[in-house]
């Protein structure tokens, strides 16, 4: 990490909220196998993620993986590893096994940071934990919190790998989708619908979900006992299980700019490597 990286704080983020970061790190990936170990400017991707998490103010950072090679690499740079089973269907299910092994109290705030987010700002990790803690004082209590960023490009708005989220007036998720939501009928039915000008005219309606979650350990136990919903299966989005159960998810616009979003494809990895080498 270098001081010129805008996603890095010079010192750990501060705040009154106590939380634990768990980073699910699965080796297998249909679009980019072994991506968590992919080299980015001399370091494996998972090390970038761990170092960001360590700057967030978390009291503990744990990498959860079912893969021996990933575990060995994480151990090699001195981070904490929890070996998990290989049959989990989602990162949240992997977290549930970590909760069981570590016997965290039901009130412990757990932040799920994806293992393919090498440039996630530490400030955003602290933000999502604080947002969940503040739900205790809210009249609309959500047991899960996440973040989003504004979309201002045509490619991103219509990219199924960029998950969109729409919110109600109080900042709670109405729906997450890989589709372009909301769909502006008047603009998009026109031949010039997908111009930059038209996308920007939507204003702040277009939000891209950032794959980071905060929840209490007790909520994770509830989550894994709920059946998988059809919406979750169709969209391949684990957070839809929560909405299907009638639970709220609090969504806030991230405090800090995310310079490079999650690495899902070889093209994403190339962007991440280019960004890392651009840092002075």
Curated annotation (Swiss-Prot):
It comes from the Bacteria. SUPFAM superfamilies: Nucleotide-diphospho-sugar transferases. Its main location: cytoplasm. One of its GO terms (biological process) is lipopolysaccharide biosynthetic process. Pathway: Nucleotide-sugar biosynthesis; CMP-3-deoxy-D-manno-octulosonate biosynthesis; CMP-3-deoxy-D-manno-octulosonate from 3-deoxy-D-manno-octulosonate and CTP: step 1/1; Bacterial outer membrane biogenesis; lipopolysaccharide biosynthesis. Belongs to the KdsB family. This is 3-deoxy-manno-octulosonate cytidylyltransferase.
